Swiss-Prot record:
SUPFAM superfamilies: FMT C-terminal domain-like, Formyltransferase. It catalyses: L-methionyl-tRNA(fMet) + (6R)-10-formyltetrahydrofolate = N-formyl-L-methionyl-tRNA(fMet) + (6S)-5,6,7,8-tetrahydrofolate + H(+). Pfam families: Formyl_trans_C, Formyl_trans_N. PROSITE patterns: GART. One of its GO terms (cellular component) is cytosol. This is Methionyl-tRNA formyltransferase.
């Protein structure tokens, strides 16, 4: 079975490894090298690094719409194109090239959380369950029929980074299972997505990291988890902007205005929200690194606590 693999970030690497064990990967498509780091040097994607290490041919077009790129893809004669977090839109002209079409590994239980940031949006919304889907691609955004899926609970204190790593491995396993069935002549039966329950996971933005104490504590705690490891939640704490790496929601009755520091100890800094309180457990001052609450309090002896 001849497969073209298309993917870019860390999430796609386990799936690439899985495909190489099941089929002949004739080419890997990934996004062009991007400037990164303080020196803004061009850096290859994680998928490119993995592909090069395995001796696989790598292609990095800006778009898949040009006649030259389409002809290149046709010349590869793929039986199947596998797409995992590629980040480049596949036009209909590409979808019709392989005999078995194009498969996509998506990090949610479709139709919930179609789009670019399904992991973060699931945690932000307080979802208790998510999963991965193997989808037959069509022209719409994550609208294709689902071939297979796997479910998993979202742990109470799980961050986006932690869930990302679990779902990446689950997606690789699901893809392996699907390819195994296809090779055996038992092609998974496509199931159309339900018309109800559709939600969209729009791309994360840096501006979203700023938390508002006028929100319930439970919602803010979910956002802290959702924004790890990026963009990292930010708050204003007694006049200082700090980043929050870990926090807990407290079901606490109080009569103080949102943003008021209710208590401060080595266990955490409890801040009044419009409903409940948010306990800050791990913080980062501007220009510094993430530190414990105890270390932060040693540096902020001016912190005003109002019972």
């Amino acid at each position: 079975m001849r497969i073209v693999f298309a993917g870019t970030p860390d999430f796609a690497v386990p799936s690439l490894r899985s495909v190489t064990q099941r089929a002949d990967v004739v080419a890997v498509y990934t996004q062009p090298d991007r400037p990164a780091g303080r020196g803004r040097e061009l850096m290859p994607s994680p998928v490119k690094l993995e592909a090069v290490a395995r001796g696989l041919p790598v292609y990095q077009p800006q778009t898949l719409r040009s006649p030259e790129v389409l002809e290149q893809l046709r010349a590869l004669r793929p039986d199947l194109i596998v797409v995992v977090a590629y980040g480049v839109i596949l036009p209909e002209a590409v979808l019709t090239i392989p005999d078995d079409g194009c498969w996509n590994v998506h990090a949610s239980l479709l139709p919930r959380w179609r789009g670019a940031a399904p992991i973060q949006r699931a945690i932000e919304a307080g979802d208790t369950e998510t999963g991965v889907c193997l989808m037959q691609m069509e022209a719409g955004l994550d609208t294709g029929p689902v071939l297979m899926s796997l479910k998993t609970p979202i742990n109470a204190h799980e961050t986006s980074g932690q869930l990302h790593d679990r779902l990446a491995e689950m997606g690789a396993q699901l893809l392996s299972d699907g390819l195994g069935l296809l090779r055996a002549g038992l092609r998974p039966v496509p199931q159309p997505q339900l018309a109800v329950g559709v939600t969209y996971a729009h791309k994360l933005g840096k501006v979203e990291s700023r938390l508002d104490w006028e929100q319930p504590a439970e919602r803010l705690a979910c956002r802290v988890r959702a924004f790890q490891p990026w963009p990292v939640a930010e708050v204003v704490l007694s006049g200082e902007r700090v980043r929050i790496h870990e926090a807990l929601a407290l079901d606490l009755d109080h009569s103080q205005p949102p943003g008021t520091v209710l208590a401060a100890s080595k266990e955490g800094i409890d801040v009044a929200c419009v409903q409940g309180a948010l306990r800050l457990c791990r913080l980062q001052r501007e220009g510094g690194k993430a530190i414990t609450v105890a270390d932060y309090l040693n540096a902020r002896r001016d912190l005003q606590v109002r019972a």
